[in-house]
């Protein structure tokens, strides 16, 4: 763009198609049904920054390995999986003759053993001679016995346990029965000794197990490499296997489900050996790169993410300009001018009814309507849930619908379970209060997601209007972050329930740009932010934009200056988000291929496995030692992009600006196949 301050904008429909095709598309949009799902315009995504540049057609996420995400930590380091933990020390293998000789020696030692006379006398006073002889026999023969006497006093029992350990050199195990007698058996001295020797090899200077990773501390940080799973799902698997509560695991940000991702995770109150052992059972996930830390990770503890994206089946629809020229010019514009930092379509769900629509009803305290929207029989829902939705629509029998609802439908299950345990009114319906109770049974992070989606819809709509009115030109009344104000926006918030973009904004304030700021070139368009509606944000002093907040919320029977609610979860403080994002370190490659199932980029795990194989002299694939697979030619064309984005920015919005395509689930850019 020759003059970035005079940005022109068009709706996505007009980006790179001819007039006749454009008219056909407009007609198609007017005639679309619920089956089409949510489209960009439904959630405020309407403009491009560089509409004059041609885009290209292609599809993302045909395979989950087409979308790689690596977290960037607060020091700017890109997180990669470079090891798969450590191997536990192996017990030395011994011959059968050695084992038998050791057993014979051990048996002879036990036969010759005599309890210290003074300690034996104490045992006789407690148990009697007959039981002491039986205890000595247990020591020598590995039998078991139970004492004749019982001992009611706990302090006495404790002393007896200690006396037995002392008398028999910790080689007997004693337990108290329900009747307060003692059951005594011989412990396995060899296994205990070997275990202790193994542990001693892996302790730090303070005697704490560390497996060679330095001084032990309260938290273990590790890299999580996952495939085709979202972060919450992966964390739930780990906590279930370790049998620990979810609160002991923290992470800086959630990562895409349909992707291969790497991120740092912290865990507390768990041994490193137990954590490391997970790699034997994890599927589609692997952990490694451990280190000890004094502090846990928290949401927002990252600078952003690095993306490697494969766009397959690329065509231009333009015979006058080469693909190389289109991609080159598009990437240049994207690097220099950026893209509108819209909340992406992922924010609004994949069902026919957008999450922001449900969020609106929650903010209006329309509990029944919100619940009915969640449970409604829609065209675009999880297919396995359609029978349950049909039952609910026809019978309002919560218990019957619950039996058919798939467990993975968390919100629906919570609603139906709660309603099935409540009484109906005389007319056979549930009360508004019953629906409210059911809504509050939805996991908190999920029910707050709905209202955050509504905030995102408003933000997108305002951002489109801001660019439409003023392009990339800074104007008086725009908002920028006030770096002199360090006080938090809100206090006492549990960060487990907030997205990384919301969490980050809790610690910043904004101020309005003045004419003096503009004259001194103190700020650029990259500094401009817009608030999502809330009770603790500053709205733009530009009257047009401020009025737009009023108009949008008024249409939904709300007031941007009154966002507090009686229900704390739905009382929104608001947050700030930059209007423009510029990808960093943007590079591209054009690759040709034939097989649609051919993997075109390598994951961290691919690279690690083949690098290790090469170093150990084993068979390896040379093509899998680097991120990019070699171009072997073919009739199909793919564009591979690599770039970095800041916290909470959506890679699909950067791709949208480059390709000039609709990013909704049923749009031209997406061809989602769930398991490849």
From Swiss-Prot:
Residues 94-110 have a biased composition (Basic and acidic residues). It is found in: Nucleus; Cytoplasm. GO terms for molecular function: pseudouridine synthase activity; RNA binding; snRNA pseudouridine synthase activity; tRNA pseudouridine(13) synthase activity. The modification N-acetylserine is found at residue 2. Keywords: Acetylation, Cytoplasm, Isomerase, mRNA processing, mRNA splicing, Nucleus, Ribosome biogenesis, rRNA processing, tRNA processing. One of its GO terms (cellular component) is cytoplasm. Disruption phenotype: Decreased level of pseudouridylated mRNAs. Residues 338-582 form the TRUD domain. Residues 1-27, 87-110 are annotated as: Disordered. InterPro entries: PsdUridine_synth_cat_dom_sf, PsdUridine_synth_TruD, PsdUridine_synth_TruD_CS, PsdUridine_synth_TruD_insert, TruD_catalytic. It catalyses: uridine in 5S rRNA = pseudouridine in 5S rRNA; uridine in snRNA = pseudouridine in snRNA; uridine(13) in tRNA = pseudouridine(13) in tRNA; a uridine in mRNA = a pseudouridine in mRNA. Changing residue 305 to A: Strongly decreased pseudouridylate synthase activity. Catalyzes pseudouridylation at position 35 in U2 snRNA stem-loop II region which induces particular conformation of the mRNA-U2 snRNA duplex and places the nucleophile in an accessible position for the first step of splicing. Also catalyzes pseudouridylation at position 56 in U2 snRNA. Also catalyzes pseudouridylation at position 50 in 5S rRNA, position 13 in cytoplasmic tRNAs, and position 35 in pre-tRNA(Tyr). PANTHER family: PSEUDOURIDYLATE SYNTHASE PUS7L, TRNA PSEUDOURIDINE SYNTHASE D. Present with 4150 molecules/cell in log phase SD medium. Belongs to the pseudouridine synthase TruD family. This is Multisubstrate pseudouridine synthase 7. It comes from Saccharomyces cerevisiae (strain ATCC 204508 / S288c). The lineage of its organism: Eukaryota, Fungi, Dikarya, Ascomycota, Saccharomycotina.
């Amino acid at each position: 763009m020759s003059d970035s301050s005079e940005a022109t904008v068009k709706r996505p429909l007009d980006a790179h198609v001819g007039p006749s095709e454009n008219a056909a598309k407009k007609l198609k949009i007017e005639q679309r049904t619920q089956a089409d799902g949510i489209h960009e315009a439904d959630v405020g995504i309407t403009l491009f920054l560089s509409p004059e540049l041609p885009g290209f057609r292609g599809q993302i996420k045909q395979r989950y390995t087409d979308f790689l995400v690596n977290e960037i930590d607060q020091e700017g380091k890109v997180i990669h999986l470079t090891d798969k933990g450590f191997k536990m020390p192996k017990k030395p293998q011994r011959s059968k003759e050695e084992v038998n000789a050791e057993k014979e020696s051990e048996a002879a030692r036990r036969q010759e053993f005599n309890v210290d006379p003074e300690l034996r006398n104490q045992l006789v006073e407690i148990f009697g001679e007959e039981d002491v002889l039986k205890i000595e026999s247990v020591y020598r023969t590995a039998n078991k016995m139970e004492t004749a006497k019982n001992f009611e006093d706990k302090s006495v029992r404790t002393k007896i346990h200690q006396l037995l350990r002392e008398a028999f050199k910790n080689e007997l195990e004693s337990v108290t029965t329900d009747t307060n007698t003692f059951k005594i058996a011989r412990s396995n001295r060899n296994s205990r000794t070997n275990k202790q020797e193994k542990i001693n090899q892996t302790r730090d200077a303070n005697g704490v197990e560390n497996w060679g990773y330095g001084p032990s501390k309260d938290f273990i940080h590790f890299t999580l490499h996952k495939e085709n799973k979202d972060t919450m799902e992966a964390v739930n698997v780990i906590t279930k296997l370790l049998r620990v509560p979810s609160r002991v695991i923290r992470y800086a940000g959630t990562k895409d489900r349909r992707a291969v991702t790497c991120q740092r995770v912290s865990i507390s109150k768990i041994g490193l050996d137990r954590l490391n052992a997970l790699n034997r059972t994890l599927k589609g996930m692997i952990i490694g790169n451990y280190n000890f830390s004094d502090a846990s990770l928290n949401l927002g503890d990252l600078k952003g993410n690095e993306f490697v994206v494969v766009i397959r089946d690329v065509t231009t629809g333009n015979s006058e300009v080469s693909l190389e020229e289109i991609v080159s010019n598009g990437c240049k514009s994207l690097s220099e001018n950026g893209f509108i930092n819209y909340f992406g379509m992922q924010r609004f769900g994949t069902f026919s009814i957008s999450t922001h629509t449900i969020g609106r009803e929650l903010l209006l305290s329309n509990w029944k309507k919100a619940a009915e929207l969640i449970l409604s029989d829609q065209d675009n829902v999880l297919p396995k849930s359609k029978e349950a939705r049909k039952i609910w629509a026809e019978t309002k029998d919560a218990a019957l619908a619950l039996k058919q609802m798939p467990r993975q439908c968390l919100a629906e299950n919570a609603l139906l379970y709660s309603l099935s345990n409540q009484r109906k009114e005389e007319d056979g319906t549930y009360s508004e209060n019953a629906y409210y109770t059911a809504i509050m049974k939805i996991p908190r992070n999920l029910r707050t997601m709905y209202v955050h989606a509504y905030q995102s819809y408003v933000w997108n709509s305002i951002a489109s209007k801001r660019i439409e009115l003023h392009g990339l030109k800074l104007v008086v009344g725009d908002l920028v972050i006030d770096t002199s104000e360090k006080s938090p926006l809100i206090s006492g918030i549990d960060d487990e329930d907030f997205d990384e973009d919301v969490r980050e904004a809790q610690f910043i304030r904004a101020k309005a740009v003045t004419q003096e700021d503009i004259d001194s070139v103190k700020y650029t368009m990259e500094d401009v932010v817009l608030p999502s509606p809330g009770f603790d944000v500053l709205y733009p002093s530009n009257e047009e934009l401020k009025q737009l907040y009023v108009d949008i919320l008024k249409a939904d029977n709300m007031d941007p200056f009154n966002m507090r609610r009686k229900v704390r979860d739905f009382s929104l403080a608001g947050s700030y988000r930059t209007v423009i994002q510029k990808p960093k370190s943007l590079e591209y490659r054009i690759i040709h291929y034939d097989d649609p199932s051919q993997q075109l980029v390598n994951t961290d795990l691919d690279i690690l496995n083949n690098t290790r194989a090469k170093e150990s002299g084993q068979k390896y694939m040379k093509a899998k030692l680097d991120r990019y697979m070699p171009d072997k030619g073919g009739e199909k064309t793919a564009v591979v992009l690599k770039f970095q984005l800041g916290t909470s920015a959506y890679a699909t919005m950067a791709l949208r600006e480059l390709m000039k395509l609709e990013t909704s689930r049923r749009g031209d850019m997406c061809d989602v196949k769930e398991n490849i």
